[in-house]
């Protein structure tokens, strides 16, 4: 009776119905848990009481045995390469080789213990450094990672026209200075004419987009951008976006962590929220011209294909058109990478894209085992987005806290101003990620360069390094450090 009542009370067993067949099967714990021993018989009608007897209260009910009762012991726990190593080595633990029910386990260097309880193993495999943290992690650091795959997806109003999902302070509270949106437009679909109070910096991820806007002087702008290109619209600048023949997906970054994609100023709503008489006067037309305006916002909707000749849409007034340093796009895809040992980097900031006066970005490629060197940014928080691969970041927060987070494609990272961090490729393929700063020039302080350029006596007296170590420190910033693709080599593990 107790088990049946517990199931009914917890909502695990629908009244009058059998247990539904699971739609998706995940690798998870099995067997008895929480006083319930599945699988449970099905019923065709409600049976049993919702509440138990007062005889079950403490001091009245019978007590469980101290030995031989329900067991929380995990027999033969499975450890992966590196888990037995010194916890302070902090080796990356690849839990993908661990199999249920004996692994993964939150153990590192003899610390922690087995996990017999409710769990979905996929989370632990994606986040090994949270589940079995390096011994160097300590204190409290706000969450710095949000997977956009967990964000609510807002669909467009047109038939399969597209969608958008966002990250802001509602899901990542630490990200106070920037927010992001991942948007998809099907072929020829529009993001409705709109504007917003935040500035918008965008990177095209897939496909191509035609962008159009005007500035306060009435100068117009239209251009086509493709994967790897960037556009920027200052606060309040009205604009439209239309996917070209192959559709598009793009990443938007805003200079306000509280930005919401659901609170932009839409042209359709603008027409609906003032009297028709006023609009007729303003547009110098008859009131009847407003009979066919949309009765609701259009947001993302299907449209007429854009003409291949962009000049057909290059409408100008007496103020002319915008281009060059006044233009709203930068064809970043055509910029070559700076290549170095371990990876590649290219930078876009106001030195070459002046209209985006407070947005600076780096697109980074890390080879397997490589490291975006330990660094920090002096004047800006860092907003990061991972386009490919898997990586981890440890964030150092003064005076003595640190935490390590794991990232895969589609994840957003956020590191507050001046907090030290690195990015390490933990996978078998290249990691591609974007760093975005609110700064007039992209820059950082390199920890190794700082130590190399500080008087040697000071470094030796402070940190205890030998001359041999200091002799090898580069005096020029390296940005990327190559590394062993076998991340457990220091423990004698195989790759």
Where are the regions a protein language model picked out?
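Fungal secretory targeting signals
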Residues: 1-22
């Amino acid at each position: 009776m107790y088990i049946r009542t517990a199931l009914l009370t917890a909502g695990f067993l629908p009244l009058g119905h059998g247990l539904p067949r699971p739609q998706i099967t995940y690798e998870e714990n099995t067997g008895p848990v929480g006083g319930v021993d599945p699988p449970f018989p099905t019923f065709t009608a409600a049976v049993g009481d919702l509440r138990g007897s007062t005889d079950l209260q403490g001091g009245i009910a019978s007590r469980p045995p101290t030995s031989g009762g329900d067991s929380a012991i995990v027999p033969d726990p499975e450890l992966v390469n590196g888990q037995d190593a010194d916890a302070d080595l902090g080796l990356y633990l690849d839990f993908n080789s661990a199999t249920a029910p004996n692994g993964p386990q939150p153990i590192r260097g003899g610390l922690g213990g087995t996990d017999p309880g409710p769990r979905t193993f996929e989370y632990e495999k994606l986040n090994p450094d949270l589940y079995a943290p390096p011994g160097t992690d300590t204190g409290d650091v706000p969450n710095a990672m949000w997977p956009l795959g967990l964000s609510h997806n807002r669909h467009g109003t047109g038939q399969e026209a597209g969608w958008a999902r966002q990250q802001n302070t509602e899901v990542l509270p630490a990200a106070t200075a920037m927010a992001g949106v991942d948007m998809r437009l099907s072929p020829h679909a529009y993001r409705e004419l709109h504007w917003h109070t935040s500035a918008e910096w965008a990177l095209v991820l897939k496909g191509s987009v035609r962008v159009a806007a005007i500035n306060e002087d009435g100068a117009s702008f239209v251009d086509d951008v493709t994967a790897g290109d960037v556009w920027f619209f200052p606060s309040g600048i009205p604009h439209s976006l239309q996917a070209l023949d192959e559709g598009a997906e793009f990443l938007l970054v805003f200079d306000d962590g509280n930005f919401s994609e659901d609170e932009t100023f839409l042209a359709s709503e603008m027409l609906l929220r003032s009297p028709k008489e006023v609009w007729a006067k303003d547009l110098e037309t008859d009131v009847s011209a407003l009979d066919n305006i949309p009765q609701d916002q259009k947001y993302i909707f299907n449209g007429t294909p854009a003409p291949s000749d962009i000049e057909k849409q290059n409408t100008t007034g007496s103020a002319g058109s915008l281009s060059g340093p006044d233009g709203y796009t930068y064809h970043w895809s055509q910029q070559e990478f700076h290549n170095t040992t371990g990876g590649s980097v290219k930078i876009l900031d106001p030195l070459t894209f002046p209209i985006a006066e407070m947005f600076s970005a780096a697109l980074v490629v890390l080879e397997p085992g490589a490291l975006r060197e330990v660094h920090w940014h002096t004047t800006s928080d860092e907003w990061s987005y991972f386009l490919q691969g898997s990586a981890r970041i440890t964030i150092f927060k003064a005076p003595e806290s640190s935490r390590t987070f794991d990232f895969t494609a589609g994840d957003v990272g956020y590191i507050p101003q001046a907090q030290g961090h690195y990015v390490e490729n933990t996978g078998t393929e290249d990691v591609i990620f974007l760093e975005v700063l609110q700064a007039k020039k992209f820059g950082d302080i390199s920890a190794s360069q700082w130590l190399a350029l500080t008087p040697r006596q000071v470094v030796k007296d402070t940190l205890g390094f030998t001359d041999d170590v200091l002799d090898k420190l580069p005096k020029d910033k390296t940005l990327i450090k190559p590394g062993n693709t076998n991340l457990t080599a220091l423990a004698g593990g195989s790759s």
